[in-house]
Structure formats: C-alpha cells, structure tokens
C-alpha cells in the first residue's frame, strides 16, 4: 500500500526505453545499451483479479437488478467496396506501408493522417486533402499521397445501399432507427438525410447546436412529430439520454473511442425498455482499416467486460494490452494480415445478451460475398544505420 511503484512493477505495465549504439564495425559483437527512461502505462495483470478482487468484490450489472431487460446483440455487417474504390484504397495503403518501411521518421509523423484517410476513404471516396511531408515546406514538392476523387455525394456507395435496405426492413417491422456517424469532416449526415427523405422516410439530424440538457426533450418532440430515423454523432448521446423509442441502432462508421462506443450503443438497452430486443449494427468495409479497427474494438470490449465481472479468456488476455488503437492499427496494417469476417462476427456474438428470446439476429442476408485471395506487396525491412537507436520494451507482470 505504501509502495505504489513496487505494486506497479508486480501487477502493472512498465515501458522501458533503451538506447543502443550500433555501428557497422561492431554489428556482431555485444553493443552498448543503456536505459534512458521508464514509465508506467495503463494496463493491469490478470493476476490482480484472482489475487485481490474475486473474493472481495461484487460485480453488478443491469441484468442483476431483477428487472426484465430485452435481448441485446451487436451485429457487424460487412460491405464490399466498388472495384475502382478498392484499387485506389490499395494504392493508398501500399504507399503508407512503403513509407513506414523506408522512411519511418516521416511515416510516424503522418501516421494519424493516413489512418484517418484509410478509415474514411471507403465511405466517401472524394473530397479528401492530400497528405504532405511535414519536413518539406514547399507545397508543390511535399505531397506524399493525393487521393483520387471517385464519384460524388450524389452517388450511392455499397454501404449506403446496405444501410437503406436495413432501415427499410426495420421500418416495415414497426421499429425506429438511430444512425450514428463519427467522421465530422465528412458530409455523411446531410447525405444520409437526403437519401432517406428521397425515399419518403421522415428523418431528423441531432447536432451539437442542441444544448445538452435539451437533447432528450428535443428527441421526444421529434418522435411525437413522426420521425422514424434519427441521425447523430455518437459522441452527442454517449451519456445521460434514454432513447427507448429507437430499438435498432446502426453505426454507419465508428470512431476509435471505446468509451463513446459502449455508451452510445446502450442508449436503448435500459430497464424501462419494453421492446423484446435491441440490435446494434456496425457497418464496415471488409478487409479495410474499418475492419481492423472493429476487430480491435471487439478485443478491447472483451477486456472492458472483465471490469464488470464478465470474465473471459479473450478479456483477460487483452487486459495488459495498453497500446492505443491508433498505434495498434498501424501495426496491423504493416503486418498485412487479412481479417476473417466470420471470426469478427463470432467475437461480437460472444458478448450478446439473450434472456427470453434466444433467436439469431436477422442479418444473414448481409453475409459478406466471397472475395479473391489478397495479394500483398512485399515490404522490405528497414535498414539499420550506424547511429544510436531508441526502442521501447514493454513488460506486463
């Protein structure tokens, strides 16, 4: 208790940074290494639960309150990019891989911009700014990638078609739908509102202009006016709102924020919900950055449920994983591994909550089509120069 550092060394995650002098003359001999600094990172060893918490803690959730709750399931829906969009996406992805391999100094500086571009481009393959070399001031000489514009806001993308089809089916079943969007720089909300209006669906956009304390009243008023689809950013409803009138929640795209996702996805799964089931759909393009991000989110969600007493092997394994999603996505992209759609669906299926209505979600019609085997471009290893290098070593005790 009085030695927090010793406790963290035993049960936490420690990052140790070293400097190693390597030259071409002593590459085969023992190089000089010295510790530069160390710091503790967010993360905890699974031993903490068996040693300190299991016999001394009570985990409560809504299921334990003695109230009748609806079934709850999160369902990933894969989509397939248009061929011309996929071609440009692959070019952008390979450019980033090449940059990280050959020019890691530049790659690390533009990593966030590239990951955001690779996440947003499949949804909106137009209107993106070029990615520039931060070390070259001349704008006519510093362009690293200039995404091609394919189509416009008037063109339907495959994800749009899946979304409209799903909304149409849910409205025919008498449900109301929430559509969450996350990319604030895209015109997604206005586009979707226009598409729904043209199909005769009454929709409304909840934006940040509505004060926080008035949002629930604003939503109730729109429901009484006959609104069937609510479009909003998930960050605007993450806390404090009960949206029981909407029993189908669709994430058109997802930001890399686990807390916001968990809060927004539970807005309708409340104690006073009278519907038999609440379904959460997550739309993504298969074998893209969206796919990788969603798979990492599933792993993080599994770890988060351990805190609530829902212990699983996957959750325990992810507890000591302290890296942020951006860093993990970059590593996943460099590895070049193809994700499995069925594995992703199974990961979310494990976290579903079924009580009195144990039936599979009606999402089979959106199963991913067969795709040709991916051909990955070879990525050469970075060349070690005869200069001092720094590296990070993580150890979870």
Question: Which residues fall in each region the model found?
Answer:
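A conserved SF2-helicase RecA2
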Residues: 259, 269-344
